[in-house]
A protein has these predicted regions:
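Hydrophobic alpha-helical connector segments
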Residues: 81-121, 171-178
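Helix-turn-helix
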Residues: 22, 26-68, 72
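Residues at secondary-structure transition points
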Residues: 10-18, 22, 34, 60, ...
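Short, basic, alpha-helical segments at the C-terminal edge of helix-turn-helix-like DNA-binding modules
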Residues: 71-77, 85
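N-terminal intrinsically disordered/low-complexity leader segments
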Residues: 1-18, 90, 216-221
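Solvent-exposed, amphipathic alpha-helical segments
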Residues: 22, 26-34, 80-87, 123, ...
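Hydrophobic/aromatic-rich alpha-helical bundle segments in the mid-to-C-terminal region
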Residues: 118, 138-142, 146, 160-221
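Short secondary-structure transition hinges
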Residues: 104-153
């Protein structure tokens, strides 16, 4: 072991992927707080507590940094949602009401019900909108949106399998419809949080799932 008087001279071992993710954290913080235009290399470096040269060491240019930030956002949302999915949708135990409640709880992960999810919604809409005029972002924004669609689809599928939703539900159609609902609610809540409260968002989601069960119970017209 090196003598204590030499410890400060020993080089630090930095995990490149961990550092890249820390820089992505800084991008997310700047964009959520001040908008995409504020996410310059200088501002991101300041947010991360790094020199601009250090950021450039891990990202060749601004486009690569933004692309990684989009990819990292999609990865984090997916990991967080599926950390809950196994617990909420595993097996078919419990009453139909219990399984339905677990489904609703999982889908609420896509709504801005706390600061973390609120920032995710803001970031998702910001990056997706920016991709319309920034070609380097487009493919990656589309991939993020596809990942989120698959998460919703798998959530409904798991709920259907466990008996929380009707067996005859058109999963693809209802996944698109539910994604549109969740996206719309998320955007409205991000823009007008005093009007679109957490209680209101939960109530709308609850009513939507009620409508799926009710439509199935009525049967074909």
């Amino acid at each position: 072991m090196a003598p204590s008087c030499y410890k400060d001279l020993m080089p630090k071992i930095v995990d490149p992927q961990q550092r890249r993710r820390a820089v992505a954290d800084a991008v997310h913080a700047v964009v959520a707080r001040c908008g995409l235009e504020a996410a310059t290399l200088r501002n991101v470096a300041d947010e991360a507590g790094l020199a601009v040269g250090s950021v450039r060491h891990y990202f060749t240019d601004h486009d690569e940094l933004m692309i990684f930030a989009v990819q990292e956002l999609g990865r984090r949302v997916g990991e967080r949602v599926w950390a809950h999915a196994e617990r909420l949708l595993s097996g078919s135990t419990g009453s139909r009401e219990d399984r339905r409640r677990r489904t609703e709880e999982l889908l609420a992960e896509f709504l801005p019900l706390d600061d973390v999810r609120r920032d995710e919604v803001v970031l998702r809409h910001t990056f997706t909108t920016a991709a319309r005029t920034r070609p380097p972002l487009l493919t990656h924004a589309e991939a993020m949106q596809q990942t989120l669609h698959e998460l919703v689809h798998r959530t409904l599928q798991g709920a259907q399998t466990s008996g929380g939703l009707p067996a005859d539900l058109d999963l693809e159609l209802e996944s698109v419809r539910l994604r549109a609902l969740l996206d719309g609610l998320g955007l409205q809540a991000a823009l007008f949080p005093r009007r679109f409260t957490s209680d209101l968002l939960r109530e709308v989601l609850h009513h939507h799932l009620d409508s799926l069960v009710a439509a199935s119970d009525r049967g074909p017209e």
